[in-house]
Structures are given as structure tokens and as C-alpha cells.
Amino acid sequence: MTIPTVIDADGRGWDIYSRLLKDRIIVIGTNFNDAMASSIIAQLLLLQAEDPKKDIHIYINSGGGSVTAGLAIFDTINMMSCDVNTYCMGMCASMATVILSAGTKGKRNILKNAHTMVHQVSGGAQGTAADVERTVEFMYSLRKRLNVILANSTGNTVKQMEKYCDRDYYMSAEESVEFGLVDNIL
């Protein structure tokens, strides 16, 4: 993918993501993995160091991905001293929905034609029977942890989250507000 460049008023050229970062805007437009999470975390930490009181804005269009990578971003957002505004554009699914819900209450946004989706953890395992069993136990613990996180973020109960996340559960912008994932439709 070619990354576009922009020229600012001073004639300086920037790649578009660096220029957006200057305005405290982070864009998540890929699935979650460790390298992507490290990049997002580094951007959050940089913005926090530059001004611990000024809002950060995260725009998300992602199908989700690695739960552990997403949880690293989630925890970093929650340790920020500044408010974090989140925006769903297109689709926030799976781990991307968790990140969307991590924004500061009242500052979690969704565009009017965007959608969200929650579901239970999925993955695979191979190896010895003992290794597979341990992986399954780990997946159950992640599922339980994510249900608690989403319950806290949305105001739903853990039991409700277990029900909603049993299968893919898609929501429109309006349904996402009703569900408690976001606060505003833009």
C-alpha cells in the first residue's frame, strides 16, 4: 500500500499518518497483531508525553484480530491521563469493538452508516493433548475477561455479554448506542 503524503503550509512534506499524529489523531485501519499494537501504543505514549491533558482521537475501521495485541492497546488507553475519543468508521468488529468502547465515556462515537460486531474469542490449537487443553483453558479465560471488559464499558451485565457474544452479533450505529458501546452518532 502506498502511503499518501501531504504538504503543510510551511512546504514541509509528511506521510499522512505522521501529519495526523501531529494533530493527535491515530488511525487503526488494519487487523490487530503485535506489530500493529506496538505502533499504536507508541503513538499513544508519545501523545501522552507531549501533552498529558489534551484529547487524543482514534479512528477505527477494523475487523479485529489478536486479542492479546488488542488488550495491550486497551490497557494503554485506560492508563492515559487525557481523554481518548474513539470513532467507528465502516466496521469495528471483535477486538476493534473493544477498543472503540475503551474511549472516554461521552466521547465514543460512530458514523451513521458504520456497524459494530461482538462475538466470543476464536482460535485454534495444536500439539499434545495437554498443550491443546491449556490453550482451550486460556481461550476460556480470555472470553471471560472480554465479557467483563465489555460489561464494564457498556453497562450490560456479564451474563448479558455472554449471551450477546455467544455468536457474531452485528449492530447498526443506533443499536451500538443502545447497546452502550458508543455514546454519539456523527
Task: Name each model-derived stretch.
Residues 1-186:
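Terminal-region recognition feature
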